[in-house]
Amino acid sequence: MAIPRGARFAFLALMAWAAALSVPVFPQAVTRKTTLAGSPPMGWNSWDCYGTSVTEAQVKANAAYMSKHLLPHGWQYIVVDIQWSEPNARAGGYNPEPHLDMDRYGRLIPAVNRFPSSADGKGFKPLADYVHSLGLKFGLHIMRGIPRQAVVENTPVEGARVHAAEIANKFSVCRWNNDMYGLEMSRPGAQAYYDSIIRLYAGWGVDFIKADDILRPIHRDEIAAIHKAILKTGRPIVLSLSPGPARAEDVEFLRQNANMWRVSDDFWDEWRLLHENFTLVGIWGGVGRPGGWPDGDMLPLGRIGIVAERGTDRHSRFTPVEQRTVMSLWSIAQSPLIFGGDLPSNDEYTTSLITNDEVLAVNQKGSHGREFFSSGEQRVWVADGPDAGAKYLGVFNLGEREEDIRIQWPELGLPPACVLRDLWDRKDVEGPRGTHTFRVAAHASGLYKLTPAR
């Protein structure tokens, strides 16, 4: 396609931003290797559908569904989100003065009334064992810092000759949750506390930790402390950081200390938020690589809001066309794919969105997904395919009327003779040599693979 003048300026601006970060827009291919989070993690998180009050039975039901229907397609993580230690957690928000279950060392443990298998000090190990028995991996959410309750009780820190009140920073608090104080990492015993909680969770069999209230604003010392604690356990645990948006200037630090980091605030089923995420995700184009992935947040698809912190029980308010646009962007951007809906409630269409192996291959096998072109409400993304010379192509119309988007293969660095395959429809597309005009409906998208003809 002939890229309009304004779009070329936008593209050059992106190149200038990337150069300032020493991150090439079109970096050389990185060979995928067997490493932790070698491809974007794929899984389920309880937040979008069950908010603060998810139960063991609900987690097990989603794990069973994933094992039966999604594991063959690469989905593997089951993650319990916030407030799992609070017996009286409720829908619709956080309790202002929560009572949290914790052990004698000020470490949070599951609320037995919600997670019965955790009784008698077993923690999440029985639930993690169940998840592992299904061929899946188990994760949990933590808040930055130490429970305020532990500070009030001045509990000892396991493995150190200090107590909670000596390491807490009472001026370092979360703006939206009253559970924790931050840790003053310069004080003796602060690292020991993080070591103790990660050691406990590793003993339960945790494979994934979502650390919250740690990225915006960024708390580098506590991120590094959690990363260090994970390394000490010797267990491969994926570390996810929230909430976003992360700062682009922190990219190297994030790569060194985490496996995924949020690039947006909480993402819900609103077109306005999806439109914004095209910009936020686009900033990080080409940055993801094995071991470290910019994260567009959970996928609010299927049935959500059942007993959530926000909203009511509903099927995703995204239209079917918009739901496909979400999956197309997350796939070509190589964002982690963390499904937010209640899996057993999935309808046929929702299941089709997350079991199309040709689409999922863009996310799992592609590399350096980046915005190639932006003009008005048109967006074009490209990513490098795993096959020599192949590219993935995403076309998006964020506007309110149908648009034609014309692309010429040589502008993508491809020869005129290419096979164009529609990945959603799983069929090759016939058309003139060297070019194609994509007719894209309002809020819609297309996802394709271009392979040089032999």
Task: Map each language-model feature to its residues.
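Aromatic-lined carbohydrate-binding/catalytic grooves of carbohydrate-active enzymes
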Residues: S67-A202, V206-D213, R220
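C-terminal beta-strand-rich structural cap/linker in extracellular carbohydrate-active enzymes
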Residues: G431-R454
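Glycan-recognition surfaces
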Residues: E166-S172, E184-S186, A192, S196, ...
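Bacterial N-terminal signal peptides
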Residues: A10-S22
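Carbohydrate-binding surface patches
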Residues: R324, W330-A333, I338-G340, S374-L414
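Aromatic-lined carbohydrate-recognition surfaces of secreted/lumenal glycan-active proteins
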Residues: L136-V151, R216, L231-A248
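Catalytic cores of secreted or luminal carbohydrate-active enzymes
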Residues: T325-F373
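Structural recognition of the beta-strand scaffold that forms the well-ordered cores
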Residues: P41-S46, Q76-D81, K137-I142, A202, ...
